[in-house]
């Protein structure tokens, strides 16, 4: 099943973005998100190695796909901080709100996507996680204090932001 989903993700990336440098790096990014989601579902942990691969891909992507500028660099650096630091603060204030892997994943993906798309991906991912949690509570599969694995939800939101980021940002925020 994993292979079928991975193939669909690659097809979607190439279909939406084309068979070029942007499309290929985005497909690699999407496959790494699928690996994070699968690892979180199976083991309850996001491997640091996958997060490091995403961060390295972000640096490679910046030099391949972006016209190098100080503003572009700042946009991506802010992306790493603006989504992960609030998650870290919430996690420190509310025990078990987010796992360390989720926070590191958001830092690396923020570096890859830039701040606007990272925020959009986080909003979508947390919305999906909220709906999923609500369904679990309604059907008495979990309680309000239960821990859920949100990497699959975040991966979906971040993947959507990678493929349709500008459209999503305009629809959500009007930027």
Describe every region a protein language model picked out.
Residues 14, 18, 42, 91-95, ...:
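Membrane-water interface at transmembrane helix exits
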Residues 150, 156-175:
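C-terminal domain-closing interface element
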Residues 24-131, 171-175:
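Functional transmembrane core segments of multi-pass inner-membrane proteins
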Residues 1-20, 170-175:
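N-terminal transmembrane signal-anchor/hairpin module of polytopic inner-membrane proteins
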Residues 1, 128-139:
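Alpha-helical transmembrane segments within multi-pass membrane transporters and channels
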